Every structure is written in structure tokens, then in C-alpha cells.
Amino acid sequence: ALSSGLPVVGTYDGSQELHGMVRVNRNTNEVIEGIKTILLDYPKYVELTKKTRQNYDWSVIVNRMYKMYKTIGIISKPYTSEDTKNLYMNEYGRNEEYSEPTQEVVTPTVVEDSLRFNYHFVDGPYFEFLSDGDTDKEYTVTFYDGEKEIYSSKMKPNTWTRLNRKYYTPWRITLSNDNGDLVFDQTMSLKGKRVYIAFDSSSLGDSIAWIPYVENFRVRHECEVICSTFKNDLFMSEYPYIEFTQPGSVVKDLHAMYKVGWFNNSFLEPESPNTIPLQKTISNILGIPFEELQPRISFRPTERPIVGKYVTVANESTAGLKYWNHPTGWVELVKYLNEQGYQVINVSKNGDNIPGSTKLTETSLETTMNYIHHSEFFIGLSSGLSWLAWGIGKHVVMISNFTEPDHEFTNNCTRIVNHSVCNGCWNNPMFKFDKGDWNWCPEHKGTPRQFECHKSITPEMVINQIKHLIK
């Protein structure tokens, strides 16, 4: 707040002198008196905050704010709207432990003897210019998305600015003097530069869906890519030109950084993620044209675990609306497969077993992948195990009616749907999924129609759709 020119009433036990702040103890009367003190001489305290900005090391301020907030907007002026204020307060109130901030690289470019420039694209475009000369002279900085002007502002030397937009944009940054002459003009180029792509989601399915776009980005921009995922072991040997690191690691010497996740924030992604295919989430953030890309998984099959033909299934997932909730669906499907001479292996980690099937007791990813690999085909839900099966090249029968057919993948997949009932709520822009509500069903929760999207899919519907796979 002080760095934004706002006087502060608060507790502080440090040795740093914070001009513009009235220090108080955690006592209601002291807080009230502190507020009165500032209000009675408000212009004086606003002026005092300038000393704090001059005396306090900016790198310390920014470093500490990175630890405290996930998202930092332009902090060169006070809050301009209640929404901005709420964004900061909500992030602070989450009380999460964030990792050390990424070390940002700055690229100095000398255009005039008296001016020096630093810029990068780590978590949004950043521009700073420094001068040992006239520090009161005003310049105009402009950020462009290609040829389209996005933001323009007056700046004086020895100040900086950055934009809230975090997803990939072909940025161009210019600085002009009061005569309109350009003294700085730089178009972003990532060729040969270090770029950090961080997966925000720890979900197995998200990680598998997104990883091929990281490689696509690396090849497209001819850059050095560092990537953090929660499933690095699944990808490292298959993507040898990507430098994998653990989430939360400090990554140095960067020119750009992009976070990939489900943010529902227009500064972090150009489209609402629940309205588009899962892979388009990352293609949007990285600025890559969307197409369905097959991931590569680090997997080497071992010997066949079962004699005879068998099918792998997974009947568990992470939310109630993902389940195939037909009361006898799985039982009748397994019975049919047994009658056709197939053993059925249930590779779900949790939950009860299905009568007529065998449930794995050793459910490491390596074991699970080996069972899926040697099976005739895989039957599952909209879940990480379906993405895993697809990633290692197994035909997937997916029972999913709450997402649109293109939300997951379409190649090498048999999709089971029933569009005669309520369906596709996941991709409806009117609804936002509530992770904390196991029974989330936005239109019919608490009624007999709850989860009808999957209850209405009968065993016969599934059986009829998989007959072409039966040998």
C-alpha cells in the first residue's frame, strides 16, 4: 500500500523506517486513534509515502509481494476499482504457502547514453527504464498486441510498469519522448531464450492433455523450455529437449513465463476453460492454434500380466457427476464381457470392486499402464486414467455425458452419450464447477433428475457401442 502511495495504519515490528505509516498495537482504540491521526493530516501522510518508495529497495518489495500474492497487477498507483482490491484481498486471504518467486531475467538495451531499459515477459510483460539524467522528463510507454494498442501510459525515468495479461501475446513495447520520437522499440522474440511453463494443476488428466503443447511451443519458437508438472516422470524420457523441474523450484535466467491451469480469469487465459476442449486450455495460454495432439508417455511395457484376453476398466473418479450412476450399469457390462470370454481388471485405485471383475491391489502408475497396455481395450469415465490409457495408445471407451464430446479426445475413442436428457453442463458457460460439492449438479441437484446424464445411459447402450471391439 505504501508503495502505491496509500498511508497505512498497522502493526510493524521491523527496523525499516516506513514513512507514511502510523504504527499501532493490536488494540481497537489505538487503531482508531491512528486512523484519526492520518485523516487529520492526510496530504502530509500521502507525501511521506514517497520517502518509503525512495528508501525501500524495490526488489525487496516485489519479492515479498510475489510470495504473498499469486497475481500482481500494476502497483504503481492505488486501487482503481473494488474488483482489483478484492482480487488482492482474496489471494491474501487464501493463506496458502507459495513457493519462492521465479528469478526474472532482464534484458538491458541502451538506446541513448542517458537511458537504460530492462524488459522481460515473465508472468506478463514488464518494462523499466532508468536514467542518470533528467528524472522529471515524461515519456510515453505503449504495449501492443501485434499491431493493436493494449495499454499506454506516461512514465518518468527510474520507474517500471507491467501488465496484468499473463497468457502468450506477441508483445511489442515502445517508449517515446515528448516530441513523439521513439527511444525504445522492441518486439518480443523467444528464439534462443529461456521460457518457463508451469502447470498449475496436479491432475493426471490435465498433465497428460497439456504436455504435447509444451513441446509444440518449444519447436514453434525455437526456445529453451523449462517445464514444471506434478507428473514429470511420465514425460521426461519422451521429451528430452524440455528441461523438467519440480513445482516450486527456483528457475533462473528467464525471458518469459506462462502458467497453465483453470483460472477463470481473463487476465490469465483468453477463454473460460470450462467452455472449451481441455487441450485448448493450454493452446490458448501458449498462443498455439488448437488441434488434438497425442501425448507421449514414458512407458516401457513388461511381460503380459494375465494369460488370456481381458479388458481394463476404471469406475472411480473425483466428482459425483463423473460417475456412471446407472444402478446396474457396471455389473451388467462386466457380466456381458465375461460371457464373451473376457476377464475384467478394475484398475481404479479407490472404491468398491465390481462383481465379476478383479481389482488391482498394486496400483502404481507403472503397473496400471502395463495392465492397460496388454488389455484389449479400456473402459472408463472422463478421468485421468482414460487420458493415461489414451496416452499409451489404447482404445478408450469413455462413458461421459456431462461434458461435450470434444472436451476430452476424439481419436481412438468410442464415446458413450445420451443427448436425449440433460447433458453437457460442464461446458455450459452459465455454470462454474464447485470442487467442494461432491453432488454438484447445477440444474437438478436435490431432485429425482440429479445426475440423469449418466443414470440414463443403460448397459445396453454401452454394449451396443463396444460390439465392434469384441473379438
Regions found by a protein language model. Give the residues of each.
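A charged, aromatic-enriched C-terminal amphipathic alpha-helix characteristic of glycosyltransferases
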Residues: 43-80, 452-457
